């Protein structure tokens, strides 16, 4: 396939941020901030984002831009004849496994947007809202329809091309997401009693940090700063391959991280004041999105309207990631098979749809199927991506970019610093060569330990 380039720098930043911005920004980061010390946790998180997230993100961008290939072929372009190429296939596998459950969760968001807009939660009490979520999981047919809508529409957009499909749709969707987020946050801040939620969320609280344990707070901030950017499976490298060399890459990485953090912080501005206003405990994960918040919206004046806007915001957050990863998949498969873009989208679309069905069935017909450590299908697939492929892949990216066994520090530095903007200082080499891989390795080991120990 002919390699297109993105039409604008804004498109590149919004696409990359769209890939990073996902459901975790809403259902994990605000809860962690509230529980782990408020503003104090945010400061620690931002430090790790700068010393961990930005360098690894810059490496992914640099590898993609230098190779002008998908993750599947970029190692062969940068280090011909080496064994590094096998990791390109693992990157493709990681993107596929991610979509095997993420398309289902994106379908849940779309389904809740439709149900909220239709007034199906209006008048339900707390237990009835919880039953509604359980009923959704127990219905494989309806889940499959919404997952199918996500997959089919996603590959239709991707089939139109990088500029006319992916970039055009994602730019408008990301701008709409930001507007929705700001409107929801401003509304939430003016709710009665909302200021108490804001204080709990953002004011530094050392006592809360001590209760959780300073070590746990640091580990939580380190993990969140890493996982929020979806690093390690080439999901960001693909966008590096679609840009020119006018701008240096460290500055672009900072901008992407800033936009991702803005969405995460604003999500808390939506959630905490609303929950405190109605005396509802803030939880994390699906319980927050599908049980806690529908109850809050039921109590709000014009709750159906505000609930619909929130789930539209969530749908956009999930869908932006889906589109970015779909692009990565079809780019890899297209370079491997030399099929046309439309043929690649058709075959990949069918494959992703079929591979996504087990996640849906894991909540009903296959509920007894627990493939990894007694976890259901979604949690098992999430483990493979989040605990294994993301940190493991990032560790390989760091080693490849900083040592003589791979691409090497000098070539990486030259590529990352080419163009106008923020440069990576040469004196950072010892940190990025020796300290950074240790931090990523700790994240990998901690993730595996926590999964099997829990």
Feature names for model-found ranges:
Residues 5-16, 41-44, 83-96, 145-150, ...:
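Select transmembrane alpha-helical segments in multipass membrane proteins
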């Amino acid at each position: 396939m002919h390699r297109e380039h993105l039409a604008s720098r804004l498109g590149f930043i919004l696409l990359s941020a769209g890939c990073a911005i996902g459901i975790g920004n809403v259902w994990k980061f605000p809860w962690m901030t509230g529980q782990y010390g408020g503003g104090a946790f945010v400061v620690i998180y931002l430090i790790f984002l700068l010393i961990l997230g930005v360098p690894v993100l810059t490496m992914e961008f640099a590898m993609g831009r230098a190779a002008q290939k998908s993750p599947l072929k970029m190692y062969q372009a940068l280090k011909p004849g080496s064994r590094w190429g096998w990791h390109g296939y693992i990157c493709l596998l990681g993107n596929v496994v991610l979509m095997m459950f993420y398309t289902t969760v994106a379908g849940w968001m779309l389904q809740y947007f439709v149900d909220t807009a239709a007034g199906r939660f209006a008048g339900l009490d707390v237990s009835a809202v919880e039953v509604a979520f359980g009923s959704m999981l127990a219905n494989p047919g309806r889940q499959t329809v919404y997952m199918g809508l996500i997959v089919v529409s996603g590959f239709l957009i991707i089939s139109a091309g990088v500029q006319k499909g992916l970039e055009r749709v994602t730019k408008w969707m990301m701008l709409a997401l930001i507007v929705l987020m700001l409107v929801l946050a401003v509304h939430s801040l003016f709710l009665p009693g909302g200021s108490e939620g804001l204080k709990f969320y953002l004011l530094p609280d050392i006592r809360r940090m001590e209760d959780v344990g300073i070590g746990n707070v640091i580990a939580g901030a380190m993990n969140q700063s890493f996982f929020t950017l979806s690093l390690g499976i080439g999901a960001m490298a693909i966008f590096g391959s679609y840009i020119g060399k006018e701008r240096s890459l460290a500055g672009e990485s900072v901008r992407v991280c800033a936009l991702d953090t803005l969405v995460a912080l604003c999500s808390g501005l939506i959630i905490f004041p609303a929950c405190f206003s109605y005396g509802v405990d803030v939880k994390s994960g699906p319980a927050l999105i599908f049980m806690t918040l529908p109850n809050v919206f039921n109590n709000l004046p014009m709750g159906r309207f505000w609930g619909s806007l929130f789930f539209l915001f969530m749908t956009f957050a999930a869908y932006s990631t889906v589109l970015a990863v779909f692009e990565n998949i079809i780019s890899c498969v297209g370079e491997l098979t030399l099929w046309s873009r439309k043929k690649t989208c058709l075959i990949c679309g069918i494959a992703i749809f079929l591979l996504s069905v087990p996640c849906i069935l894991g909540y009903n017909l296959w509920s007894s199927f627990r493939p990894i450590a007694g976890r259901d299908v979604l949690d098992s697939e999430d483990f493979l991506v989040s605990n294994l492929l993301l940190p493991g892949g990032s560790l390989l990216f760091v080693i490849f970019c900083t040592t003589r066994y791979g691409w090497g520090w000098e070539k990486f530095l030259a590529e990352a610093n080419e163009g106008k903007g923020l440069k990576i200082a040469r004196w950072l080499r010892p940190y990025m060569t020796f300290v950074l891989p240790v931090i990523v390795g700790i994240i990998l080991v901690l993730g595996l330990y926590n999964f099997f120990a829990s």
